[in-house]
Amino acid sequence: MKLGVNIDHVAVLREARKVNDPDILNALYVATQNGADQITIHLREDRRHIQDADAYAIMKYSNVGVNLECSINRAILDIVTDLKPHRTTLVPEKREEVTTEGGLDVVGHEDEIAYAIELLHDYLIPVSLFIDPTIEAVEKSKELGAEMVELHTGAFANLYAMLSSSLPHSNHSIKELELPRHELSIRLEKSILAIDEAAKHAKKIGLEVAAGHGLNYHNVHEMMKIAEITELNIGQSIVARSIFSGLGEAVKEMKRLTSR
């Protein structure tokens, strides 16, 4: 399994005080020295964490592939085509969201996504689409010309957390998931099945398959059971763990959990 370490949240901490501490390049170095197979960053339109200068520096100094996440905004795409990352993952984006809330609407925004893919391909940049784990979204991704899909695991992660963590007893409990445990268990199994079926179908029609969003040290084993998934992109949980263990140890432990 290929482990993509998302270092956005290192930049979140830096931007909280508008200083160069922690240094994003230090995070890049430590992550790659301790098992990261890929570095993932999200260059958002609102620049809430990763800045343009970060993206250019990471592209310059990374000795592993860089997976750059971005929206289909033309101004952002112009920067991406200049950066020429090893891969671009197109993601949905809303300014008011705390984090990416769902997969790309590959049907509703078909023309805009097709244009973005064509533009990136003109610069020889492979494209992945961040999609909800449905057969329809997988098939549309193939039709649009993407080489890869990243299956959005957020719904799975939320259900897992409400069943198996202290989340229900915190201020961040997910109100719509405050359900009896047996109902949560049924929904969790359905979410895992949806990811499994989407991954198998994607592989069958010639797409590479990644997964990400909300994956952590407690739930990642479920994704490891799906052979068609060959890449996981994980960020917040690694950076959160690093507060207590150090970034190097946090990356090493996740690499151990995601090794086949």
UniProtKB/Swiss-Prot annotation:
Q: Does the keyword DNA-binding apply?
A: no
Pathway(s) of this molecule:
Cofactor biosynthesis; pyridoxine 5'-phosphate biosynthesis; pyridoxine 5'-phosphate from D-erythrose 4-phosphate: step 5/5
Q: Keyword RNA-binding, does the record have it?
A: no
Q: Which UniProt keywords apply?
A: Cytoplasm, Pyridoxine biosynthesis, Transferase
Which sites are catalytic?
42, 69, 213
Q: What is its main location?
A: cytoplasm
Q: Which domain of life is it from?
A: Bacteria
Q: Which reaction does it catalyse?
A: 3-amino-2-oxopropyl phosphate + 1-deoxy-D-xylulose 5-phosphate = pyridoxine 5'-phosphate + phosphate + 2 H2O + H(+)
Q: What is this protein called?
A: Pyridoxine 5'-phosphate synthase
GO CC terms, sorted: cytosol
Query: What EC number(s) does this enzyme carry?
Result: 2.6.99.2
Q: How does it assemble?
A: Homooctamer; tetramer of dimers.
Any one GO MF annotation of this record: pyridoxine 5'-phosphate synthase activity
Tell me one GO biological process term: pyridoxine biosynthetic process
Which organism encodes this protein? Sulfurimonas denitrificans (strain ATCC 33889 / DSM 1251) (Thiomicrospira denitrificans (strain ATCC 33889 / DSM 1251))
- Listed InterPro entries: Aldolase_TIM, PyrdxlP_synth_PdxJ, Pyridoxine-5'_phos_synth
Task: Tell me the compartments it is located in.
Answer: Cytoplasm
SUPFAM superfamilies from the xrefs? Pyridoxine 5'-phosphate synthase
Indicate the family of this protein: Belongs to the PNP synthase family.
Q: What does this protein do?
A: Catalyzes the complicated ring closure reaction between the two acyclic compounds 1-deoxy-D-xylulose-5-phosphate (DXP) and 3-amino-2-oxopropyl phosphate (1-amino-acetone-3-phosphate or AAP) to form pyridoxine 5'-phosphate (PNP) and inorganic phosphate.
Residues that bind 3-amino-2-oxopropyl phosphate: 6, 17, 214, 235-236
Residues recorded as binding 1-deoxy-D-xylulose 5-phosphate, renumbered to this chain, are 8-9, 44, 49, 99
Spell out the residues of the site Transition state stabilizer. Answer: 150
Q: Which Pfam families match?
A: PdxJ
